């Protein structure tokens, strides 16, 4: 296949492992073949391990991380350590960017409202949670089922478990979205806000 003497051996396409030398080996009948049998591979391994540096190389290969399974187990170990962190995406109508927020850092809806005000610079979020009928923006969230609900409709612990992402909508869009505050919501948020 490759032209001898033209230096095309490097670019030659062939079947086999990369950088593998095809050494012709004579079998018992004197025929030449390009495959190495298992005993030859084992003999080569024994020769390397009998030399002084071979034992260190075996240990080095043993400690070396290769392949995807160790990476997955590494990620699992790190996710166990960060189980208390629960990041959700937060978007605001009119803002050209999304943010991530850790819900685990907040103790309740009032802390969340202050953080949203600070994050997006839209003041009045705390008042919007306390007085649901007034305010320019309304914070809503998507739960596990994919339903959009008003922030504050459920107790804080249930909100923490079910929230997938947050969105700050304009009030007119939220009414068109079909989100109406519950009658008992106002008292609940006032008690949480104190």
Swiss-Prot record:
InterPro entries xref list: AUX/IAA_dom (IPR033389), AUX_IAA (IPR003311), PB1-like (IPR053793)
Region Disordered, annotated ranges: 40-62
Subcellular location(s) per record: Nucleus
Induction note: By auxin and cycloheximide.
UniProt cross-references to PROSITE patterns, sorted A to Z: PB1
A cellular-component GO term for this protein: nucleus
Motif EAR-like (transcriptional repression) mapped to chain: 13-17
Example GO biological process: regulation of DNA-templated transcription
Keywords carried by this UniProt record: Auxin signaling pathway, Nucleus, Repressor, Transcription, Transcription regulation
Limits of the PB1 domain: 85-173
SUPFAM superfamilies recorded: CAD & PB1 domains
Highest rank taxon of the organism: Eukaryota
Transcription regulation recorded as keyword: yes
One Pfam family from the record: AUX_IAA
Subunit-level organization: Homodimers and heterodimers.
Notes concerning its domains: The N-terminal half of the protein contains two conserved domains I and II. Domain I includes a slightly degenerated ERF-associated amphiphilic repression (EAR) motif which seems to be involved in the activity of transcriptional repression. Domain II is required for the correct degradation of the protein through the SCF-mediated ubiquitin-proteasome pathway. Interactions between Aux/IAA proteins and auxin response factors (ARFs) occur through their C-terminal dimerization domains III and IV.
Function description: Aux/IAA proteins are short-lived transcriptional factors that function as repressors of early auxin response genes at low auxin concentrations. Repression is thought to result from the interaction with auxin response factors (ARFs), proteins that bind to the auxin-responsive promoter element (AuxRE). Formation of heterodimers with ARF proteins may alter their ability to modulate early auxin response genes expression.
Family the UniProt entry places it in: Belongs to the Aux/IAA family.
PANTHER family: AUXIN-RESPONSIVE PROTEIN IAA17, AUXIN-RESPONSIVE PROTEIN IAA19
Name listed for the protein in its UniProt record: Auxin-induced protein 22A
Organism (species): Vigna radiata var. radiata (Mung bean)
């Amino acid at each position: 296949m490759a032209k001898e003497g033209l230096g095309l051996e490097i670019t030659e396409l062939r079947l086999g492992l990369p950088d593998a030398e095809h050494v012709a080996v004579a079998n018992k009948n004197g025929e030449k073949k390009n495959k190495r049998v298992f005993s030859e591979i084992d003999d080569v391994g024994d020769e390397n391990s009998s030399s002084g540096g071979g034992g260190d190389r075996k240990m080095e290969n043993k400690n070396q991380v290769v392949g995807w399974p160790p990476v997955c187990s590494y990620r699992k170990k790190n996710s166990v350590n960060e189980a208390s962190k629960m990041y959700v995406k937060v978007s605001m109508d009119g803002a050209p960017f999304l943010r991530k927020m850790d819900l685990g850092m907040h103790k309740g809806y009032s802390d969340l409202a202050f953080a949203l005000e600070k994050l997006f610079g839209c003041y009045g979020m705390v008042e919007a949670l306390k007085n649901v009928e007034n305010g320019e923006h309304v914070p809503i969230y998507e739960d596990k089922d994919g339903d959009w609900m008003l922030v504050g409709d459920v107790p804080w612990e249930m909100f923490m478990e079910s929230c997938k992402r947050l969105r700050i909508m304009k009030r007119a869009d939220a009414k068109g979205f079909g989100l109406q505050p519950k009658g008992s919501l106002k008292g609940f948020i006032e008690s949480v806000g104190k």
